[in-house]
Amino acid sequence: PGIADVGLDQEKALVLLEGIYSTVIMRDILERETRRGQKRITDPVLLKKIVMFLADNIGSSISVSSIGNTLVNEGLLEDSRRKGTPSSHTVQTYVDALLESYFFYEIKRFDIKGKEFLRTLGKYYIVDIGLRNYLLGFRNRDSGHALENVVYFELLRRGYDVSIGKVDNAE
């Protein structure tokens, strides 16, 4: 949201980022579902874990099934009420809600030889790197994916249609 451009100190910036995160996740996603009378997004803990996973893996090829499996395998969804891995359908529903809120953007993979978009292993980018830093903490690792995130949004801003090209195993 251009926090650096307006000269906010880090403490005020974190308060602003917390407000943006809370508004998008709590109001725009969870409350919107309630107002619509839908019960698609019912688990705020799962939603937050998916947000954290996607934020930590921006620019990486991800399948919906790998999100649920990773959350369970790393013990991030340990809860007495929860039984097993969330279904791919459930995870996809939560990811779709995040995409509808414009918190994350998805980029599809394109098979150059087959000349078609593939349904799996797309990439996700967070709308603002400041939000990622707020969620995961400020760290200097993974600067390549953070830069890729910035480039993706700059290409969108300039009007380009962006997709991932794939030929055999090369991207």
Model regions and ranges:
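Accessory nucleic acid-recognition modules appended to NTPase machines
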Residues: 5-171
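Amphipathic alpha-helical segments of the small helical/lid subdomains adjacent to P-loop NTPase cores
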Residues: 1-2
